[in-house]
Amino acid sequence: DKIDEIKRVSALSAPVKYQLKDNKVIIDFPKDFNGKKLTGEALLYCPSDENRDIRQTFSILDEPLKMKVPVTKSGLYQLQLSWQDGKTSYYFENKIFLK
């Protein structure tokens, strides 16, 4: 369940890192996932207006996840990541301000 998925993220060797650059949110997963294919969904959830949500499914291997963000979508969001490394599920969320 989600509580276990959050605990698994806390137990990783490093935190999930993200940054906003060139109208993209770039998400770096810890080295624990090197050589593992990650599949899942990323959501930029806008609490004030669900029509501003940005959702993206992904499948990556040893690369950062890049989410395009339209310039019209500035404001406070919650970054929600749900992913699997083939056998184990993980969940991460944090607030992010898009400019």
Predicted feature descriptions by range:
Residues V9-A11, N51, S89:
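Short solvent-exposed loop/turn micro-motifs enriched in small/polar/acidic residues
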Residues S13-P15, D22-I26, P64-K66, Y91:
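Intrinsic-disorder/low-complexity, polar/charged segments enriched in Ser/Thr/Lys/Arg/Asp/Glu/Gln
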Residues D1-D22:
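Transition segment at domain starts
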Residues D1-I3, F58, G86:
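Generic hydrophobic, helix-prone segments enriched in Leu/Val/Ile
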Residues K7, V16, K31-F33, K68-P70, ...:
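Residues embedded in well-ordered secondary-structure elements
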Residues S59, K95-K99:
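Short beta-strand edge segments in extracellular beta-sheet folds
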Residues V25-Q80:
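Structured, soluble extracytoplasmic/luminal domains of envelope-associated proteins
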Residues Q84-F92:
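Short acidic/polar inter-strand loop motif in beta-rich domains
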